[in-house]
């Protein structure tokens, strides 16, 4: 499996399609200025800006409020403490899931029974709704706009198509913001000397 195919599989829940390296080569032949933008988006400076953007999201993305479910309440202050202190090691867009699990454990203990899947989902949705958005495509588009680049087009997931120079920054953003699954199926990584994945 190529790294481009790996990236496509990892991003299929965010975008409908991703360009591959051959698409980028074709674009740069037709418009050499694209090569400069590609180099910029693959630079350490661009990654540093993306990291700074992620840090600012900790405050900008959240809309905390009390949660009440069947007589059990978790106050806004308690949620903030859990979010910023107890579960700080959990990536930002997965962190509220940990807070919700904590609350669900409290509810189950007080009610002396497990919540059904539907009840758990209802509680999870209360906590997920505290994020302004959880969509990496939207967040990356916002980042591009703040940095002076053209934002990504607003469209439904199936119609989204990432240019090659944006595929790896979005993948990086996803792995930074979400608790991603392990890839136990990957046993070896072979880097062809013709492919340069370094900065």
Question: PLM ranges: what are they?
Answer:
Residues 1-198:
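Alpha-helical nucleic-acid-binding subdomain
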């Amino acid at each position: 499996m190529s790294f481009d195919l790996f990236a496509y599989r990892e991003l299929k829940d965010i975008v409908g399609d991703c360009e591959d390296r051959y698409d980028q080569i074709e674009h740069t032949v037709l418009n050499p200025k694209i090569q400069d933008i590609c180099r910029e988006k693959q630079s350490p400076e661009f990654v540093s800006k993306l990291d700074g953007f992620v840090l600012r999201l900790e405050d900008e993305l959240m809309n905390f409020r009390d949660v009440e479910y069947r007589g059990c309440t978790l106050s806004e202050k308690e949620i903030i403490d859990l979010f910023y202190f107890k579960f700080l090691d959990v990536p930002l867009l997965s962190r509220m899931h940990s807070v919700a699990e904590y609350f669900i454990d409290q509810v189950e203990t007080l009610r002396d029974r497990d919540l059904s899947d539907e009840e758990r989902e209802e509680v999870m949705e209360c906590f997920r709704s505290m994020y302004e958005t959880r969509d990496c495509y939207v967040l990356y588009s916002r980042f591009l706009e703040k940095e002076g680049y053209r934002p990504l087009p607003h469209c439904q997931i199936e119609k989204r198509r990432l240019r090659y120079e944006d595929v790896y920054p979005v993948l990086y953003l996803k792995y930074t913001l979400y608790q991603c699954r392990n890839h136990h199926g990957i046993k070896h990584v072979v880097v062809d000397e013709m492919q340069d994945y370094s900065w």
